[in-house]
Swiss-Prot record:
Family note: Belongs to the universal ribosomal protein uL2 family.
Protein name (database record): Large ribosomal subunit protein uL2
Biased composition (Basic residues): 37-55
Swiss-Prot/TrEMBL keywords: Ribonucleoprotein, Ribosomal protein, RNA-binding, rRNA-binding
Entry keyword Ribosomal protein: yes
Length: 277
């Protein structure tokens, strides 16, 4: 994948960039693997906003991605196409299995049209092949990792994501996540070899707010810019929060929301590294 910079023909174009989509081999998805996706606009069943800053955006169709692949052990497949998916940052690959079935998977770096893909413990260590962690050599970079055996891929699904298998000891394997976190998962969990494709996605400059609106993201307004009726930080002369600690629009203290003592905490060897400011 490459990135093409826009010419500064307008203020919105200046500084903006876009993917070249050079790896895409087909523009229309496989009809049998597409489902309708209804836009909720951040509303619940009563029509009230429960998730702010959502709404609008281009109409999308949902592509069914195979995150399990357990039922295709020993059945090889050929990569028919590399396609764009509007619902995720990664590209997707359409597989044609020898038994006649078609399925989508996340397209890793190096996977191209015509390649052979396998599933199961006996699969080779090649990008796109899915097998249990116990059958993958330590030091290998993987993606689409399960948290529970048979539960489907949960970790390492975004564009450019790569999880390194550091060690295997007993029933658990130690992984280093893209965030720097080190955690353990069962060696029976499956993972796909390689790094997720579309690596340059993180370097795209959106250029203007309108491109975020196309993605269905609405503006996020600061509390200090609101009136007192709208937010606890609102009102006052100038940018003042009234001396109180940051709170949500409903008065709840901002900050950590993760449950303390979550059962899976015991599997986290080292917390994620803090971002450099």
């Amino acid at each position: 994948m490459g990135i093409r910079k826009y010419k500064p023909t307008s203020p919105g174009r200046r500084g903006g960039s876009v993917s070249t989509f050079a790896e895409i081999t087909r523009s229309k998805p496989e009809k049998s693997l597409v489902r309708p996706l209804h836009s909720k606009g951040g509303r619940n069943g009563h029509g009230r906003i429960t998730a702010r800053h959502q709404g609008g955006g281009h109409k999308r169709a949902y592509r069914l991605i195979d995150f399990r692949r357990h039922d295709k052990d020993g059945i090889p497949a050929k990569v028919a196409h590399i396609e764009y998916d509007p619902n995720r940052t990664a590209r997707i690959a359409l597989l044609h299995y020898v038994d006649g079935e078609k399925r989508y998977i996340l397209a890793p770096v190096g996977l191209k049209q015509g390649d052979r893909v396998e599933n199961g413990p006996a699969a080779d260590i090649k990008p796109g092949n899915c097998l249990p962690l116990r059958n993958i050599p330590t030091g290998t970079f993987v993606h689409a990792v399960e948290l529970k055996p048979g539960g489907g891929a949960k970790l390492g699904r975004a564009a450019g994501a790569a999880i390194q298998l550091l060690a295997k000891e007993g029933a658990y394997a130690t992984l280093r996540m893209p965030s720097g976190e080190m955690r353990q998962v069962e060696v029976a969990c499956r993972a796909t070899v390689g790094q997720v494709g579309n690596v340059e996605h993180a370097n795209i400059s959106w250029g203007k707010a309108g491109r975020m609106r196309w993605k269905g993201k609405r503006p996020s307004v600061r509390g200090v810019a609101m009136n007192p009726i709208d937010h606890p930080h609102g009102g006052g002369e100038g940018r003042t929060s009234g001396g109180r600690h940051p709170v949500s629009p409903w008065g709840k203290a901002e900050g950590r929301t993760r449950k303390k003592g979550k059962p899976s905490d015991r599997l986290i060897v080292r917390r994620r590294s803090k971002k450099k400011r």
